[in-house]
């Protein structure tokens, strides 16, 4: 299978970089062909040794060094670009014959954005991975999960030891045990 990983978080090192490396290595180990989908001019810190597909919609938006007055503007810009990247990803899935798409670091905002774009109707399975659900975010997550439930190829995978996000009427919300 050709599996695309849509990465839009820029970090010099740490969690996101390591998680992408783990995903890519495991996909290769299982015989899949991983591909990275990233925003235009994405500044890679690591060579993952896979094909790179650049998404239209603008560069990554980061809060690094931004004043508290600039952050609300950047937040709006980030949301607009996320939707643009998802629209582009829906097109690239067809163009590059992608079988599944993984969004490795999601929040309820990612679900909301995904559901506003053609990506929700993708023939490829779309997996949004959540690294836990923060205190106070459960209600927003469940609300968006109910909306996503209408789309049979959208999966919400939560890395957690808890199972309070699971609901019988949300079959594509799934728990993934963390590697502890």
Question: What is the meaning of each model-derived region?
Answer:
Residues 100-107, 115-136, 154-158, 175:
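Active-site proximal beta-strand in glycosyltransferases
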Residues 7-21:
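A short, glycine/small-residue-rich beta-strand->loop->alpha-helix junction that serves as a flexible
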Residues 135-180:
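A short, active-site helix/loop in glycosyltransferases that binds the activated sugar's phosphate group
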Residues 11, 26, 32-78, 108:
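N-terminal strand-loop element at the rim of the active site
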Residues 1-4:
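Extreme N-terminal starter segment of soluble prokaryotic enzymes
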Residues 71-82, 88-111, 124-129:
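Short N-terminal targeting/anchoring amphipathic segment
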